[in-house]
């Protein structure tokens, strides 16, 4: 928890504290719950024990200072995109984004993270990619099928050299009409984005990285 809260160089939470009008810190450690509150970087009381627990972890809650920032309203689309990236890069970490303003919750939980293996591991998501042996995207084909049962049949009848199978659970979200944050929180869409490999968005999308030139 110290590494995560401290940031890359151990100063992450210190900087956030200095730029916040208020910060609440709760630490669950060694069977006890500790808490401390800061206002504009100044502790309001010493670290104190407020209860007992069997859990471990750190919770940081902060309010950006209006004296420092001209805009203190969070953009949920930016947060969702960043948290989705982190969930891919940190295998086994479950990230939950709650927007209490409109009562929405997004869960990012990609147990396999990113992998360069032949069979792309997408554990924790509905559907698994059965990759092909061919490494040339121009010669590779991806077949999208509905459900694991259809996926099993397709895997048995495919040409393993050039045909990959990706089972998707149920009817996939219509991304043309969906909000961006809802789109990237969809497990099926996340699975598809990972399998295709070309990324999404203006900054990340790169058609040259597309892993299959034929998608059915």
Curated annotation (Swiss-Prot):
UniProt miscellaneous comment: Few gyrases are as efficient as E.coli at forming negative supercoils. Not all organisms have 2 type II topoisomerases; in organisms with a single type II topoisomerase this enzyme also has to decatenate newly replicated chromosomes.
Similarity comment: Belongs to the type II topoisomerase GyrB family.
One cellular component (GO) term of this entry: cytoplasm
Taxon lineage: Bacteria, Pseudomonadati, Pseudomonadota, Gammaproteobacteria, Moraxellales
GO molecular function: ATP binding; DNA binding; DNA topoisomerase type II (double strand cut, ATP-hydrolyzing) activity
Compartment(s) where it occurs, according to its Swiss-Prot or TrEMBL record: Cytoplasm
GO BP terms: DNA topological change
Name of the gene this protein is made from: gyrB
Catalyses which reaction(s): ATP-dependent breakage, passage and rejoining of double-stranded DNA
SUPFAM superfamilies per UniProt: ATPase domain of HSP90 chaperone/DNA topoisomerase II/histidine kinase (SSF55874), Type II DNA topoisomerase (SSF56719)
Protein name: DNA gyrase subunit B
Domain Toprim: 140-216
Task of the protein: A type II topoisomerase that negatively supercoils closed circular double-stranded (ds) DNA in an ATP-dependent manner to modulate DNA topology and maintain chromosomes in an underwound state. Negative supercoiling favors strand separation, and DNA replication, transcription, recombination and repair, all of which involve strand separation. Also able to catalyze the interconversion of other topological isomers of dsDNA rings, including catenanes and knotted rings. Type II topoisomerases break and join 2 DNA strands simultaneously in an ATP-dependent manner.
């Amino acid at each position: 928890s110290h590494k995560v809260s401290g940031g890359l160089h151990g100063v992450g939470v210190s900087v956030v504290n200095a730029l916040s009008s208020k910060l609440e810190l709760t630490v669950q450690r060694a069977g006890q719950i500790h808490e401390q509150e800061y206002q504009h970087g100044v502790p309001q009381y010493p670290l104190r024990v407020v209860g007992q627990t069997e859990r471990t972890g750190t919770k940081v809650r902060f309010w950006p200072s209006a004296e420092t920032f001209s805009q203190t309203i969070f953009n949920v689309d930016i947060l969702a995109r960043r948290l989705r990236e982190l969930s891919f890069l940190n295998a086994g970490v479950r990230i939950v984004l709650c927007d209490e303003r409109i009562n929405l919750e997004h869960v990012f939980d990609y147990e396999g993270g990113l992998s360069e293996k032949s069979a792309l591991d997408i554990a924790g998501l509905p559907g698994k990619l059965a990759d092909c042996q061919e490494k040339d995207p121009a010669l590779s084909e991806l077949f999208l099928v509905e459900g694991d049962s259809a996926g099993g049949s397709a895997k048995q009848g495919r040409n393993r050299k050039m045909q990959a199978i990706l089972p998707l659970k149920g009817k996939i979200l219509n991304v043309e009409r969906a909000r961006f944050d809802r789109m990237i929180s969809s497990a099926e869409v996340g699975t598809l984005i990972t399998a295709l490999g070309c990324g999404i968005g203006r900054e990340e999308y790169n058609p040259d990285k597309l892993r299959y030139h034929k998608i059915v």
